[in-house]
Amino acid sequence: MAVAALEQEILILRKRRQLYSLIGLLLVVAVLVSGFSKSNEMNSGGFLQGLSKFFDYPGEIVAEAWQAGPAFFGLILTFVPAMLETLNIAAVATLLGGAMAVVLAMASTRNVDSWGPLIPVVRRIMDITRAFPELIIALFLIFVLGSSPVPAMIAVAVHTAGALGKLFSEVNENIDRKPIEGLSACGASWLQRIRYAVMPQVAPNYLSYFLLRLEINVRASAILGFVGAGGIGQELRRTIGWGQGAGDETAAIFVLLFCTIMMIDQVSSYLRGKLVGSGRAH
């Protein structure tokens, strides 16, 4: 009897859970439909009208690239300098942001004996740097510094410092404290404990997150070109703005971006796998 009653109770709970899930799903669908209808009304029905032409522009780009013939590959080469500029922005920003992230992570983690009153202050600083997207920071800096790669580099570096700082601090919280306590008992300073007890433990994970962030920053640097921050994004904005007649150049930029990001992703994934594997081995 007790088993039958328990099975009946489980069945009731399961049906109740399914009912709640269905109600939640219906509410989400209702909100999405309502929001879409309102947005479409504000846009004078432009979304549905434009949906029928969704593939028109990509079709024009492909057609113009096909008409270019072998010269299309020459077009790809003409945009390599702009792509290198984007890679430089991403690399420098990742290096600067990564260096700042290490400092922020070490100053915001109790597990590495950081100064107590400083920890919440540094954590709030990291929250602030993560709160603003790179695009918003870049727009502000372009207004102050003018259109150049420098605002993009600073914007990506600031956001990287906050994002990596958070990840690095979580890595710090999971380290073994025995080496730190041993060096502390020997009279080692805080910097010596960080260098000889903390960094050997966290370095593989730090580098893995660093490489992952480099992938993200390459994409971010390309997007920032749309707001005048230089690089391949600025060239893409120019070719798209010209419309018909520049479709082959637009296609060349897309191909170059795709190949570059794919190559970076593959190399980064391979290196991160090696780093994480070596970290576990130790």
Role assignments for model-derived ranges:
Residues M1-L95, A107, N111, V276-H282:
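N-terminal, non-cleaved signal-anchor transmembrane helix
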Residues S34-E41, R130, A138-G146, I240, ...:
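A structural signal for multi-pass alpha-helical bundles of membrane permease subunits
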Residues T94-V102, M106, L135, A152, ...:
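Hydrophobic positions within alpha-helical transmembrane segments of bacterial inner-membrane proteins
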Residues V102-A107, L167-N174, K178, N217, ...:
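Membrane-spanning helices that line or support transport/gating and their immediate boundary helices
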Residues V103-A138, L167-E170:
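Cytoplasmic-entry segments and transmembrane alpha-helices of multi-pass inner-membrane transporters
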Residues M126-T160:
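Generic hydrophobic transmembrane alpha-helix motif, especially the helices
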Residues S147-V198, P204-R213, Q266:
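Membrane-cytosol interface at the C-terminal ends of specific transmembrane alpha-helices
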Residues A251-H282:
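C-terminal transmembrane helix and the adjacent membrane-cytosol boundary/short C-terminal tail
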